[in-house]
Amino acid sequence: MASGGTGESGFTVEAAGRALEAACGDVGLDAAGARLVRLGSNAVYALADGRVIVRITADAEELAEVARTVAVARWLAEVHLPANRLVSGIAQPRVVQGHAVTFWESVQDDEEYATLPELADLLKQLHWLDEPEALALPYFDPAPKVRAGLAGLGAGVRPEDAAFLCERADRLEKEYGRLDFVLPFGLIHGDANIGNVLRNRAGRAVLIDLDDFALAPREWDLIQTALFYDRFGWHTRAEYASFVDHYGFDVMNWPGYEVLADLRELMMTLWLGGKAAAEPKAAEEFARRVESIRTGGDRHLWQPF
């Protein structure tokens, strides 16, 4: 396991490693040789056998949210929607050394994303489902996430940039409240984009990152793909057209598109701002994004992060 380093909220590699060893020991798994995949608000480890992914929260305060994610994953398995699966036979989530821990089946050996048509098909299948009341999913509201992002702007952010983003957030919150959505309200993934749909070992597309499931206007699940094509140039015209064709609705033709796109790119920028003090590359990308938002500049210069 790696040593050194600190994630968000002061979560260290050492603390995560101790929790990993204890949690694996509790359930009879071997933590030796585990690879740290990511350290942020969560630590994510791939066990050496290549079949299990372990997620560890920075503290147990997120236990309720983690328990909801576990419930979502179990329900998706029951309705046979292709998604990340929990390791069977283990009571989850587990609280170990003050951290909430979950164990997931590894989707693949080598990172391979699925296609936009496959993402559209999965979203269409998901959006047709009626959510069970037992999941107690929250109603989606962008305001708390935006406000948390603003509060998380650190020492690496100039005061004038923070003030500009705060003013923009105020305006977008009001505009969001006036939107007239046209798609049915219901279950959403919450962070639907090409980075959250992987191809598994059997060659099938599966949804991952189930933390943001909520009840909301379905337009929110379509906005990132449109934004990545329209403003960032991360998808081609043909790729986006295939997404629209498979889902059956083009959110870019809806009058509220610009407001949702502005909100999503603001959230993406605030997330980077929270990393700016500790990560020079994040600070550089954050500054680039703020300047382009302020001036109406070309978002094609934005880099995935």
Please place each PLM-identified region on the residue numbering.
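ATP-binding glycine-rich phosphate-binding loop
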Residues: 26-48
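Juxta-kinase regulatory segment immediately upstream of eukaryotic protein kinase catalytic domains
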Residues: 1-31
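A glycine-centered beta->alpha junction motif in the catalytic cores
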Residues: 58-59, 97-113, 128, 146-156, ...
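Active-site activation/catalytic loop segments of kinase-like enzymes and analogous catalytic loops
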Residues: 218-251, 263-280
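A cross-family kinase active-site recognition segment
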Residues: 110-163, 183-185, 215
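Active-site acidic catalytic loop and adjacent metal/ATP-binding pocket
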Residues: 41-48, 53-54, 86, 174-222
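A conserved alpha-helical element in kinase catalytic cores
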Residues: 13, 17, 53-97, 110-128
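ATP/Mg2+ or Mg2+-diphosphate-binding catalytic cores
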Residues: 3-8, 152-156, 160, 238, ...
